[in-house]
Amino acid sequence: MDDMAENAGISARKLLFLPYLMGERTPHLDPNARGAFIGLSAIHERGDMIRAIMEGVSYSLADCLSVLDEMGVRPEKMLACGGGGTSALWRQMLADIYGMSVSTVDSKEAPALGVAILAMVGAGIYSTVQEACEKILRLKTTTAPIAENSEKYAKVYAIYKALYPHLKNDFGALAEL
């Protein structure tokens, strides 16, 4: 699937996906929000739809990151694991959209390792999460953002961000049917 999505290129030939399949919680807090393809036409193929879904989920996560930005917290790097973390294309997409490096951890059970790290901090084995991560985590791959891609994604993300406010009332009306 990565090959098909990669061939579609950034913006999936002008196709956007809103990933609100079960409403939206952050930052919109709207249980009526629904998923949608915007810009779908007869020219689009499976790869375009896959790419649009990947980008839509990435933009949704960028919305979550914007909440941290508003609180004055800006991560400098990201760790990816599991499903999307195994995709080199998705890691590059995340790095480009967020403007930060995305690394994978050399662990097949990274989520469980994260829980173990939190437990060790809670038990006093390490004094901070940062200290525990520095001692325990081993990075496997690191993907740096590509400035040219970041510029392209920023233009698409601006359109993505404008869609929810335009559709909010329609989502509500649809829920009332």
Language model segments and positions:
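Glycine/Thr-rich phosphate-binding loops that ligate phosphate moieties of nucleotide
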Residues: M1-L177
